[in-house]
Amino acid sequence: MTKPIAKISLRKNARIGSNKNERRIPKGVIHVQASFNNTIVTVTDVRGRVVSWASAGTSGFRGTRKGTPYAAQAAAFNAIRTLVDQGMQRAEVMIKGPGLGRDAALRAIRRNGILLSFVRDVTPMPHNGCRPPKKRRV
């Protein structure tokens, strides 16, 4: 009977999260995606690997409260809280979407003591692309 060959990880890009607490990240990129229904804050390192993330839903808000500025502020605080302990000092901020949580999330990021290199609006704007949906009649 032949011996089974031990399988080494089949994933091309293995996860980095095994030594999360040991990694020091001095500079990162904070992505804020603010829709009308929710706000998602993702923190990556300079290479684009996700370090931490939070949303209004994971911060304990449900239903229509997820779209509020206060929920966006709580999501930004939860996403950045662990990174300040890991030593993040500088960050770039990319804001996407038309939601109410844009400014509130940015204010929460500024209050956490991280120096911002720049704040960039990366909301996708069509150059007269697809036809928009018809106007609602209420």
Curated annotation (Swiss-Prot):
Q: Which domain of life is it from?
A: Eukaryota
Classification via InterPro entries:
Ribosomal_uS11 (IPR001971), Ribosomal_uS11_bac-type (IPR019981), Ribosomal_uS11_sf (IPR036967)
Q: Name one GO cellular component term.
A: ribonucleoprotein complex
Q: Which organism is it from?
A: Phalaenopsis aphrodite subsp. formosana (Moth orchid)
Q: Does the keyword 4Fe-4S apply?
A: no
Q: What are the leading ranks of the lineage?
A: Eukaryota, Viridiplantae, Streptophyta, Embryophyta, Tracheophyta
Q: Which GO terms of the molecular function aspect are on file? A: rRNA binding; structural constituent of ribosome
Looking at the Swiss-Prot or TrEMBL record, what is one Pfam family this protein matches? Ribosomal_S11
Q: Whom does it interact with, and what assembly results?
A: Part of the 30S ribosomal subunit.
**Biological process terms in GO annotation:** translation
State the similarity comment.
Belongs to the universal ribosomal protein uS11 family.
Q: What is this protein called?
A: Small ribosomal subunit protein uS11c
Keyword annotations from UniProtKB, A to Z: Chloroplast, Plastid, Ribonucleoprotein, Ribosomal protein, RNA-binding, rRNA-binding
Location comes to: Plastid, Chloroplast
